[in-house]
């Protein structure tokens, strides 16, 4: 029986002290991109969520090189998701014996990377893809270009 070689590795970050919506803003920018491109994007973005996501991307790449022996040039982020974690609820004491609730939200981040050199479907898809060097000319007749039936036709 032939054993299929694994093409995906993942890194999981749980209970990261950050809102899931703020982490999703960054995750949406890196989903589907290559490893080098992801590192450039995360290092230049000005959000606090970039640092834990950058650590997870590094960890997933290290898992790929250690477990599968693949190079970092062939890695692509195939799946990246953010789920809400537990919410830590505390009470802040206020004046006159009152208290206000404080909610610290956490999130779970999952980064899945795929090695495109091992994935047959990915290689076939990009080898069969047709490149378009020139745009198709839009043939618009001269009379339609300037005679659109606007205000200039009426007297």
Swiss-Prot record:
GO terms for molecular function: rRNA binding; structural constituent of ribosome. Pfam families: Ribosomal_L22. It is found in: Plastid, Chloroplast. The keyword rRNA-binding applies. PROSITE patterns: RIBOSOMAL_L22 (PS00464). Keywords: Chloroplast, Plastid, Ribonucleoprotein, Ribosomal protein, RNA-binding, rRNA-binding. One of its GO terms (cellular component) is chloroplast. GO terms for biological process: translation. InterPro entries: Ribosomal_uL22 (IPR001063), Ribosomal_uL22_bac/chlpt-type (IPR005727), Ribosomal_uL22_bac/org-type (IPR047867), Ribosomal_uL22_CS (IPR018260), Ribosomal_uL22_sf (IPR036394). SUPFAM superfamilies: Ribosomal protein L22 (SSF54843). Its main location: plastid. This protein binds specifically to 23S rRNA. NCBIfam families: rplV_bact (TIGR01044). Part of the 50S ribosomal subunit. Belongs to the universal ribosomal protein uL22 family. This is Large ribosomal subunit protein uL22c.
